[in-house]
């Protein structure tokens, strides 16, 4: 079953799903902007196209992740994103 989600007044949209190869996950697109997300459980984020500038919990420096790159976010935390162009991603819930 697919579950559609919309955040930040429609600037971030995702579709949640479960599959044997990825487990529970969502795939989505972020429009240009700055966003803060909270996590309930650990997440693995893969940038599919575009790039995300990320400030992870416990860090003080922003890091850019380009298409094909992966970063992990601890559970029960929040992370900040800056998006300069429409960017797609895959989020796996670990």
UniProtKB/Swiss-Prot annotation:
The keyword Transferase applies. GO terms for molecular function: guanosine phosphorylase activity; purine-nucleoside phosphorylase activity; thymidine phosphorylase activity; uridine phosphorylase activity. It catalyses: a purine D-ribonucleoside + phosphate = a purine nucleobase + alpha-D-ribose 1-phosphate; adenosine + phosphate = alpha-D-ribose 1-phosphate + adenine; cytidine + phosphate = cytosine + alpha-D-ribose 1-phosphate; guanosine + phosphate = alpha-D-ribose 1-phosphate + guanine. One of its GO terms (cellular component) is cytosol. Its EC number is 2.4.2.1, 2.4.2.2. The keyword DNA repair does not apply. Pfam families: Ppnp. Keywords: Glycosyltransferase, Transferase. Catalyzes the phosphorolysis of diverse nucleosides, yielding D-ribose 1-phosphate and the respective free bases. Can use uridine, adenosine, guanosine, cytidine, thymidine, inosine and xanthosine as substrates. Also catalyzes the reverse reactions. Belongs to the nucleoside phosphorylase PpnP family. HAMAP family: Nucleos_phosphorylase_PpnP. This is Pyrimidine/purine nucleoside phosphorylase.
